[in-house]
């Protein structure tokens, strides 16, 4: 009887740890996506107002935010990972450009935002 109880407790504890680990990855991705969506919103406002200094300040922060959880996305959602990467790099480059191309950067930022929203829905 003791062996059976020990085995049930061990399995239960192992399952709980496994589930906790899965939840933390989803939570990490969800938190990261939410931060990036806040940043793309802030970037959009800066683009619309033509505030190049703010664009140059905000745009590059996307890379640091993305790098904190991109490996988890790459592992679990390869298609969305590639879609985000497709728009992320040009958005960052456009935000660092010498002159602000509002139309091009605005479009890239919208496409990045849409890809992030898609990932957000998938991780709910």
Where are these regions (language model features)?
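Mature extracytoplasmic or organellar-lumen-exposed domains after removal of signal/transit peptides
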Residues: 23-124
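C-terminal motif of bacterial Sec signal peptides marking the signal peptidase cleavage site
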Residues: 18-21
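Bacterial N-terminal signal peptides that target proteins for export
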Residues: 1-11
């Amino acid at each position: 009887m003791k062996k059976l109880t020990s085995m049930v407790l061990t399995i239960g504890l192992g399952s709980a740890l496994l589930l906790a680990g899965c939840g933390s990855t989803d939570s990490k991705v969800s938190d990261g996506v939410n931060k990036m969506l806040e940043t793309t919103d802030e970037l959009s406002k800066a683009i619309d107002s033509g505030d190049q200094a703010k664009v140059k300040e905000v745009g590059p922060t996307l890379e640091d935010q993305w790098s904190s959880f991109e490996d988890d996305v790459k592992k679990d959602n390869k298609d969305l990972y590639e879609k985000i990467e497709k728009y992320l790099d040009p958005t960052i480059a456009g935000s660092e450009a010498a002159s602000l191309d509002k139309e091009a950067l605005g479009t890239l930022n919208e496409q990045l935002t849409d890809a992030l929203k898609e990932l957000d829905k998938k991780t709910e």
